[in-house]
């Protein structure tokens, strides 16, 4: 996966405009938190324990992130994160009910209490956190908005898409970002908005659009299943946004947010420390290990779970690196490079706050 660094400077010009737009709309959005869709604040963990299963919102089928195979098993980075949370909360990573959602339905499902946590390629933004009364638990995957074109088109850069029609998925940040970028660069791009990622991909492959836009990693997974094979399509090098994809929970349940956040931190810290699904039991018994990874009874009680929850998390799905390689990296059909999702010691952005 290519570096997103160039996108940072290109997207800076949109920041002031975006903030102004967010603030102008904030009164309406905050008021919306009181509507019937907004579930009453409560102890999500207690409800999960009473139910005996974690209800996790995922995509309707984005390979590498969350997709159900013919046997009915869900796989992908997001699906594995759901299992990690279930392992911490319920003691068993298999106690998950996966709830497939279109992008436009994900926040109503979370706010209305249909799901306990959302792990569905969701970008962490100020507008969403402040306006929708949700909380993001940390970045699970760093991405950026990109473009895919047919290889035979010989389009090599975004500038060559001037005046083109581009397919996008409804209910995502993609359409808005593309509109801003098109105006700022005078590209005159027109969007064809489809109800789901699958429909957007079908329209693109049917030549209804000259390009398809979305998170670059998602485009890479879509390309693998493309008619004519992956080699028939090219992902352009430009990125026009930063897309930190993060698990989401409802606001006003800080205890649940803390548990979900530190499940993610355990996965990241375990990779840095060389703790894997195979050696976790031995390594986590090492008294020299950072104190928090031993999960003292005092800390575990504060989180509302059992003392060995970090061990259960890693034994259930492996560390972050294992999850990445299995679902998106060299052990997958997509062969994505770690890029920004590498450990901080390897030039990436992934690291955990201290556990002490």
Regions found by a protein language model. Give the residues of each.
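Acidic, polar ligand-binding/catalytic clefts
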Residues: 83, 87, 91, 95-160, ...
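Bacterial N-terminal signal peptides
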Residues: 17-36
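Bilobed "Venus flytrap"/periplasmic-binding protein-like clamshell domains
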Residues: 55-64, 74-89, 123, 143-199
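Extracytoplasmic small-molecule ligand-binding "clamshell" domains
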Residues: 37-121, 296, 303-305, 310, ...
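Extended ligand-binding regions for polar small-molecule ligands
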Residues: 38, 80-83, 87-89, 152-155, ...
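Short, hydrophobic alpha-helical packing/hinge segments within bilobed ligand-binding/sensory domains
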Residues: 44, 81-82, 105-110, 197-203, ...
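Bacterial N-terminal signal peptides that target proteins for export
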Residues: 2-22
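Sec-exported extracytoplasmic/periplasmic mature domains
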Residues: 49-53, 86-91, 111-115, 152, ...
